[in-house]
Amino acid sequence: YLSFTATVSYAEQDRMVVALPDSGRIVDLQRQDALGVQLFFDETSYRLMFEALDRVIRARSGRLADLRDIFYTKAPASRYTFDAMRFPWLNASQEKAVNEVLWAKDVAVVHGPPGTGKTTTLVEAIFETLRRESQVLVCAQSNMAVDWISEKLVDRGINVLRIGNPTRVNDKMLSFTYERRFEAHPDYPQLWSIRKAIRELRQQRKHADSWHQKMDRLKSRATELELRIRSSLFGEARVIASTLTGAANRVLEGEKYSTLFIDEAAQALEAACWIAIRKAGRVILAGDHCQLPPTVKSIMALKGGLGKTLMERI
């Protein structure tokens, strides 16, 4: 009996395209006479938001506690005091916004109503930040928004590593996803061969010491290669891009960033923002709180304040 969780990419008439958790499942599926699909609601995002809020509430010290107090109390945000930089290709308000980002030690807001060049300003702010930092985290509430800002950064010549389910990423950014770059890495063919050997060895189901020793060696080598490929991809990337909930992806486990940029922050759920903020030393919010608020269908949740964003609070 074969059981695993996958993602439905799309379905039409009698055809369904399913994104598998790893390529090794393809071989397993080919051996099955019949397949069944059981659809269920994915509660992962809600679980991650609850966990993030719990950590924020429980924080007694450290950077997370500092940022929480800045957002929810009258604790002042700190600033650097160096001279303003000039960006002749930007207008005065855009130039001021970029400098506000560079001056911020804790939190900054880039407020950009439609037509004011908010995206241009944000890309410039990220570009200038990368002159001072080796890597930044860029997030947004939706995959569409993440892809949009990521495309602009790629057009600027910045190495972007897109984290997230490839079925939710647009065609232009697909080659920048972690999965595609992982499979394109020079060490991947060797890793694929080892994974294949592990699957074949499992089919033998022997219990001799030599069988276990060989399995252990193969697994150890596979893990070594996986870590080496991951280290290479993250070492080369200047921008790590994901949705807010995607910041909890297993490949980002343990990662910390000096700066987090949240685009379309006025449409981002407050609880989701904290998933990404937990990984950051300072936070830059970009958006327009006068536009549409985040989508919250529950009346009870709206009454409880879920419709209010961090951008409004700050």
Feature names for model-found ranges:
Residues 116, 121, 125-154, 160-164:
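Conserved RecA-like ASCE P-loop NTPase motor core of nucleic-acid helicases/translocases
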Residues 72, 81-83, 87, 174-259:
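Conserved helicase NTPase catalytic core signature
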Residues 89-90, 98-107, 129-130:
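Phosphate-binding P-loop
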Residues 112, 165, 264:
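The Walker A (P-loop) glycine that initiates the GxxxxGKT/S ATP-binding motif of P-loop NTPases
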Residues 104-110, 134-135, 238:
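Pre-Walker A (Motif I) flank of P-loop NTPase domains
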Residues 1-99, 155, 172-196, 313:
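Pre-ATPase regulatory/linker segments immediately N-terminal to the P-loop/RecA-like helicase/translocase core
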Residues 132-134, 142, 231, 245-314:
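Conserved helicase motor core of SF1/SF2 NTP-dependent helicases
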